[in-house]
Amino acid sequence: MGFFSSLSSLFGLGKKDVNIVVVGLDNSGKTTILNQLKTPETRSQQIVPTVGHVVTNFSTQNLSFHAFDMAGQMKYRSTWESYFHSSQGVIFVLDSSDRLRMELLKDELMMVMEHKDVVSRGIPIVILANKMDIPGAMTASDITVALGLNLYRSGTWSIHSTCALTGDGLDKAMQQLSAEITKYMESRRT
Amino acid sequence: MKTNKKDEETGGNVYAHLDKTSVLQEARAFNETPINARKCCFILSKLIYIIQQGESIGRTEATEAFFGVTKLWQSKDVSLRRMVYLAVKELAEVSDDVIIVTSSLTKDMTGREDLYRAAAIRALCKITDTGMLQTIERYMKQAIVDRNSAISSSAIVSSIHLMRKSSEVVRRWANEVQEAVSSDNHMVQYHALALLYQIRANDRLAVNKLVQKFSKNALRSPYAVCYLIRIATRCLVDDDQPDSSVFTFIESCLRHKSEMVVYEAARAIVSLPQTTPSEIQPAITALQMCCTSPKAAVRFAAVRTLNKVAMAHPNAVMSCNVDLEKFITDPNRSIATLAITTLLKTGAESSVERLMQQIAGFVNEISDEFKIVVVDAIRSLCSRYPRKHTVMMPFLAKMLRSDGSYDYKKAIVETIIAIIEENPDAKVAGLAHLCEFIEDCEHDNLSTRVLHLLGREAPKTPNPSSYIRFIYNRVILESTKVRAAAVTALAKFGAQCVDLRPSIQVLLKRCLLDSDDEVRDRATFYLKMLTEAAEGLIHNFILDGLQVSPSGLERSILDYLRSGSYSSPFDLRVVPVTQQALSQPEKRVPQLVEEEEKPKAPKVEPYAAQLAAIPQFAALGPVFKSSTRIALTESIAEYTVHMIKHTFANAMVLQFECKNTMNDQLLLDVSVELEDPDGEWETGNTVQIDKLPYGEVHSAFSLLEFPDSGAISGSLGAILKFKVMDVDPTSGEPDSDDTYEQTYVLEEVDVNVSDSVQGVAKSSFGSAWEALGDDATREETFQLSTVENIPDAVKKISEILGLVPCERSDRVPEGKTQHTVFLSGVFRGGYDVLSKATVAVDPNDNSIAMNIIIKSNEPLVADLVISAVV
């Protein structure tokens, strides 16, 4: 690794380190998604509710991610905003079968999307409509309407249906995120 | 040379001149991507350094820094991660939301990287609270029995810390801890044993079992054995009927192969309160062996222990004298000092001079701490061989002249004062040395103490006028505090020596021109008193001082000012009195003499504040006196009750401190019912305890009015009444809402005369006795059958009456067949009570007779008090 990786990073070809924040209501599947993104041998068998946050590292083809997996419970939501400032992307995970909390979800999502550290820096947001495998789950387009996202033009956001247990839809979402982040970082450089 | 070295040191410390703001500013680097591990490590060290130096960091700043630190988890650098753990531990106290790193730490603690695991456990336990602890409980249990000793140890030590805030949860880990005790690793075994003991500490039976069990199957770790010895010693001291096998275990440890264990066992045996010479002997022999060790630390420990027990077991220690003699010239001065002071305690009177000469040779080389040890040894020596004061006094004076810290000088001055008080022969020489000392003393506190002593003692010497020069010099030369004390001392001369009074008045007149208010005020007051007041007033106000408790005085004056009715003058008699005059310093017990364990008389103040908070008792006025805590139950009873009697001007409040030791019961509506078989006493208001959960101590109160018949003593039956609700022992949640009534008979409550009397010493008893007149004098003579000698009789009578002896009249010279003790005190309501009790032994049949005269300024009071003795 050593020599070649340093050589390739010299030419700007190596994997870049990026920080992302993973947020969302409790029990939406944040930790499970990140677990799914790790290489099979490093995955943990058991997922317990996160307290505070955990840093998870994984990589895609061209980026090496440090993901801050934030706790979703009410009392920890205030800690999310401390991490937007130092990150280059946000993943917002939601439970698409949870129709009851749609209004709360909308509030929390708006809080994230309109946070000054997000808006002013224009960092990309990827919304993952998780648990699509559950019967009766809302589709991505339904959720877009329910959350009023179609009225939301400013900022760079995209929505994807996923299933954290099987990994369906995750690859596509991560490709999108990588592309957005690369674009974002290039725009910052210039 | 020395300064050079110092310069290098300060130059070498990069952290020396850190500024809090700039460090916190630098801490922003934590937010950068990618993380520069080396730089962050350095910043973290700075951050931890300033916290360790005691710099206070505000909550917002700390929280900001903390969130920065949490971002460092993305780095995989091992040393940085370990610094992060340290920082988290330091910031845990000052920052908000530390709980958010719980999951990160849990991940590290269960991860594969052993380097992280131990440190993560320590940090995790520091930030967690009782609620959170349950979620990590599973991991903790695993960590305690982990194969890696560092991890196991850190989990156990963290659990010991957790015991303080969430003992209930830690108790559930007992099985794992037990397993860890059988670990092969010395440290793990030691820590596990400590935790196991703490888990069971409240249950004496379980502790006993623990000692029994582990004393049989030998522990590998010497640390653990030492700890077990300490637990065993505690068992022996606490138990009324100690198990002989426990002692056998400690004794067997004397033959352990580890030096540490041998020393610990020996120390434990010699420190036990009741041991026979044959039991002590092996331990002393073991210490003697330690004395010959090549290791200085072991020798030091052995000599120090011998020194400590020298007073308790002089004969046993004497057998080591030969070894101790060798140490006199030991190059380690600390060992030499301890050896000499031990010899001073055990040695014969004849060897004292030789030893003093030895010690004088190097006294300047040892540290102040050990000089204090020497001084204390001299003090106990002087009380043993009073005639030796001629050797000791010049020695002490020489030490007093040399340089030394405040504590050291204080110890010397206290020793000289003690010698003067105990030995009248040494008085003149001692006072002369002290006078010389205050001529050149830089410690105001000591000067004022010496001046106070001079004012009290010097007028009684054959030539009082010679001291006045020293005192007046203080008025001219010293700081305000000392000047004021000197003025008071002068006034005391004037009050006691009538022939010196005119010259004192002249000196006091000069003091009127002093630059400070306090000094002028005192001078004016004393001058007025000395020129115009009667002899009795002079005695009361110059010699006796104000004997009230400062906080009581403050409260009474505040009440008076609040009441707003200034038609009646403020009555000083309602102020609670204390035994010690305002100006009297507390006596320090010399450290090397065996300390006596005596039940401490509670201070009035904490209780007074408690009582004042209860509206039912607010009208009673200030507390006159609070008794000691009296147990009304056996200490191992299901419910323990301690009683404290608070006396007010016209009533008594009994405070019952109840403790519930049943973990499956919740007590409701707890109260104590009192019943007087004679029907004289009646209970007034009571305050009950609404809820008394397991393990907590709460107080119930009952008001007793003093009966109209004038009785001030009696005994009342007491019954604890309460409702029981069964609860689940582990959670404390009630099983059901059902309750049932229950009663529990307590021991009888005795009310005595001494509850109504507060002992207050008069500094000149004779004049106070004269001043009271003969209107209310009662006399009584009777035989004492329960006591066998005069000192016991004197002690008993002062206990019964609640009066305190004056003018050291409680000290009975040996071999006398007759002795008179002067007692004085204040009856509730502020009436003076004085008493002269003459005790005599009948030489024929050794029976003891006592004649007691009681005087008061109120005849009724004299009647009441005399009734207590009859």
UniProtKB/Swiss-Prot annotation, chain A:
GO terms for cellular component: axoneme; cytoplasm; cytosol; dendrite. Specifically expressed in ciliated cells. One of its GO terms (molecular function) is GTP binding. It comes from the Eukaryota. SUPFAM superfamilies: P-loop containing nucleoside triphosphate hydrolases. GO terms for biological process: cilium assembly; intracellular protein transport; intracellular transport; PERK-mediated unfolded protein response; protein localization to cilium; vesicle-mediated transport. Keywords: Cytoplasm, GTP-binding, Lipoprotein, Myristate, Nucleotide-binding. SMART domains: ARF (SM00177), RAB (SM00175), SAR (SM00178). GTP binds at residues 24-31, 69-73, 130-133. It is found in: Cytoplasm. InterPro entries: Arl6, P-loop_NTPase, Small_GTP-bd, Small_GTPase_ARF, Small_GTPase_ARF/SAR. A lipid is attached at G2 (N-myristoyl glycine). It holds the Pfam family Arf. PANTHER family: ADP RIBOSYLATION FACTOR-RELATED. Belongs to the small GTPase superfamily. Arf family. This is ADP-ribosylation factor-like protein 6. It comes from Caenorhabditis elegans.
Swiss-Prot record, chain B:
Pfam families: Adaptin_N (PF01602), Coatomer_g_Cpla (PF16381), COP-gamma_platf (PF08752). Signal peptide: none annotated. It is a peripheral membrane protein. It is found in: Cytoplasm; Golgi apparatus membrane; Cytoplasmic vesicle, COPI-coated vesicle membrane. GO terms for biological process: endoplasmic reticulum to Golgi vesicle-mediated transport; intra-Golgi vesicle-mediated transport; intracellular protein transport; organelle transport along microtubule; protein secretion. Coiled coil: none annotated. One of its GO terms (molecular function) is structural molecule activity. Keywords: Cytoplasm, Cytoplasmic vesicle, ER-Golgi transport, Golgi apparatus, Membrane, Protein transport, Repeat, Transport. HEAT repeats lie at residues 60-97, 99-133, 168-205, 278-315, 316-350, 389-425. InterPro entries: ARM-like (IPR011989), ARM-type_fold (IPR016024), Clathrin/coatomer_adapt-like_N (IPR002553), Clathrin_app_Ig-like_sf (IPR013041), Coatomer/calthrin_app_sub_C (IPR009028), Coatomer_g_Cpla (IPR032154), Coatomer_gsu (IPR017106), Coatomer_gsu_app_Ig-like_dom (IPR013040). Oligomeric complex that consists of at least the alpha, beta, beta', gamma, delta, epsilon and zeta subunits. Belongs to the COPG family. The coatomer is a cytosolic protein complex that binds to dilysine motifs and reversibly associates with Golgi non-clathrin-coated vesicles, which further mediate biosynthetic protein transport from the ER, via the Golgi up to the trans Golgi network. Coatomer complex is required for budding from Golgi membranes, and is essential for the retrograde Golgi-to-ER transport of dilysine-tagged proteins. This is Probable coatomer subunit gamma.
